[in-house]
């Protein structure tokens, strides 16, 4: 995709790093940028990893401060004194209302100013925690809304949308990045380097990796 530019919404976690590496291979390193959001998340260690990975991969990274979210919403992802639990509706209390809507909005504003039309997000509705703003129907509706709001032809890509975590690990392996993503990315909601293996994010990550490695042995 020569002469086309892409912006990756980048957290430093498994999914967004997979998307960033795929974007580099698809569009070319010189045509890819990363945008990262600081919104008061308790797992701020991922911000450090995001900066390191972006620099290591040679990609320009922009970090935006959305910490104002603390003024209007409260949840366990932004309160390190709260226990991470699953609500009666099956959604963990780490869900941040409006987060992905805001991420896509600010990413689109930035992208238009940079002449970028392709926006890439690592959201997924297969192996996920039940967050409503990770669903394909939401992303598609947001794509239409942003195009109308800014009179611009954005294309929001979600390459992991229908992949299981095991399949996401397989994709990383296909790109020659399995070990890199295992060793360099951070996913833990509790902000523990190497993972706590107890929070919803760690459980999904470790279970998916185990499934993929087991299937790889069987081949």
Swiss-Prot record:
Enzyme class: ligase
Presence of the UniProt keyword Ligase in the record: yes
Binding positions (ATP): 10-20
Cofactor note: Binds 1 zinc ion per subunit.
Pathway: Purine metabolism; 7-cyano-7-deazaguanine biosynthesis
Source organism superkingdom: Bacteria
Any one Gene Ontology molecular-function term assigned to this protein's record: ligase activity, forming carbon-nitrogen bonds
Disulfide bonds: none
InterPro entries assigned to the protein according to its UniProt record, in alphabetical order: QueC, Rossmann-like_a/b/a_fold
SUPFAM superfamilies reported in the protein's UniProt record: Adenine nucleotide alpha hydrolases-like
Keyword Zinc among UniProt keywords: yes
Gene Ontology annotations of biological process type: queuosine biosynthetic process
EC number from the UniProt entry: 6.3.4.20
CDD domains: QueC-like (cd01995)
Reported cofactor(s): Zn(2+)
Catalytic activity of the protein: 7-carboxy-7-deazaguanine + NH4(+) + ATP = 7-cyano-7-deazaguanine + ADP + phosphate + H2O + H(+)
Keywords: ATP-binding, Ligase, Metal-binding, Nucleotide-binding, Queuosine biosynthesis, Zinc
Pfam families attached to this UniProt entry: QueC
Residues given in the record as Zn(2+) binding sites: 188, 196, 199, 202
Sequence similarity: Belongs to the QueC family.
Biological role stated in the UniProt entry: Catalyzes the ATP-dependent conversion of 7-carboxy-7-deazaguanine (CDG) to 7-cyano-7-deazaguanine (preQ(0)).
Protein name in UniProt: 7-cyano-7-deazaguanine synthase
Organism: Neisseria meningitidis serogroup A / serotype 4A (strain DSM 15465 / Z2491)
Gene symbol of the encoding locus: queC
